[in-house]
Amino acid sequence: MLKIDTAAACQTVITTFECSPGTCADLMEKLQSAYRDFISHQPGFVAAGLHVNDAQTRIANYSQWARREDFQAMLRSEEMRERNREIAGLSTRFEPVMYEVTGVF
């Protein structure tokens, strides 16, 4: 379960995906499959959430990892590299960015 906390000793990653309404459902299915079958089982994975906008042109992913290195190792794995090629084919752009939580209200 996601817990947003400034005192948490974890790495936060927010990834935004741009897509079309025609590919949004397929992209969401690929992302859910990746989290269910692979990402959530990787060392250091804490939690994640997927969000889609009303127009179905953007998907936002919020994930937490024990350490930055855990997230990077998952990205570099052969399975995730293959999955990311499929994800890239369904999105016009996606960008993972690492963040630090500085306030919770």
Q: Language-model features: where?
A:
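Short beta-strand-to-loop capping motifs
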Residues: T16-P21, S63-W65
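Glycine-rich beta-strand-turn "strand-cap" elements at beta-sheet edges
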Residues: M1-Q11, E18, G49-A60, N84-F105
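Short, surface-exposed ligand-recognition loops at beta-strand->loop->(often short) alpha-helix junctions
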Residues: E18-L31
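Residue-level signal for secondary-structure boundary sites
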Residues: T23-A25, E69-F71, V104
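An amphipathic, aromatic/His-enriched active-site/gating alpha helix that lines ligand/cofactor pockets
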Residues: S33-V46, Q64-M98
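Short, charged/polar surface micro-motifs in flexible loops or helix N-caps
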Residues: P21, A55-T57, R67-E69
